[in-house]
């Protein structure tokens, strides 16, 4: 039986994502998980793709751009508070923070994040500037 869960956004990051952004873990159910992502102002993530998960992101703060490529379809879109977007399975993606504040988003991962090896590096649209996770 599923129980109710409630969690406040942690003040410190839980991990560095494979794309180099800071991750604060929120809640998970059988069908998906929720996390908060933050990329410092002026930084560019590492381009990655996922092996088994799809994501939906909603941007909370900052300004930036998200590049996505799936097969022959490729686009770069501006992101800011109020913008949501999808990252279908197998999509190559990369994002950068172009404003004076960190770029912040919450993302739903479906199914829940399985762990190490889920994301793999791909050729991106911009040179990354963030540190790689260890």
Question: What annotation goes with each model-predicted range?
Answer:
Residues 1-36, 46-47, 117-134:
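A short, N-terminal "cap"/entry segment at the start of jelly-roll beta-barrel domains
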Residues 44-46, 65, 83-85, 89-95:
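Histidine-centered metal-chelating micro-motifs
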Residues 34, 44, 73-76:
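Short, mixed charged/polar active-site loops
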Residues 38-40, 51-66, 70, 108:
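Short, conserved beta-strand element in jelly-roll/cupin
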Residues 29, 40-42, 52, 59, ...:
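A short, compositionally biased micro-patch
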Residues 71-89:
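Short acidic-glycine-tyrosine-enriched beta hairpin
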Residues 80-81, 89-116:
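Ligand-binding loop in jelly-roll beta-barrel domains
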Residues 36, 46, 66-68, 105, ...:
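Short hydrophobic/aromatic-rich beta-strand segments that constitute the beta-sheet cores
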């Amino acid at each position: 039986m599923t129980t109710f869960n409630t969690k406040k956004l942690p003040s410190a990051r839980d991990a560095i994502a494979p794309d180099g952004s800071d991750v604060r873990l929120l809640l998970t159910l059988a069908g998906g998980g929720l996390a908060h992502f933050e990329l410092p102002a002026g930084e560019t993530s590492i381009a990655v793709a996922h092996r088994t998960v799809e994501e939906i992101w909603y941007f909370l703060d900052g300004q930036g751009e998200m590049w996505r490529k799936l097969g022959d379809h490729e686009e770069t879109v501006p992101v800011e508070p109020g913008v949501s977007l999808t990252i279908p399975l197998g999509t190559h993606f990369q994002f950068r923070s172009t404003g004076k504040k960190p770029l912040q988003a919450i993302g739903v991962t479906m199914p829940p994040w399985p762990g190490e090896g889920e994301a793999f590096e791909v050729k991106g649209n911009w040179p990354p500037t963030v540190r790689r996770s260890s």
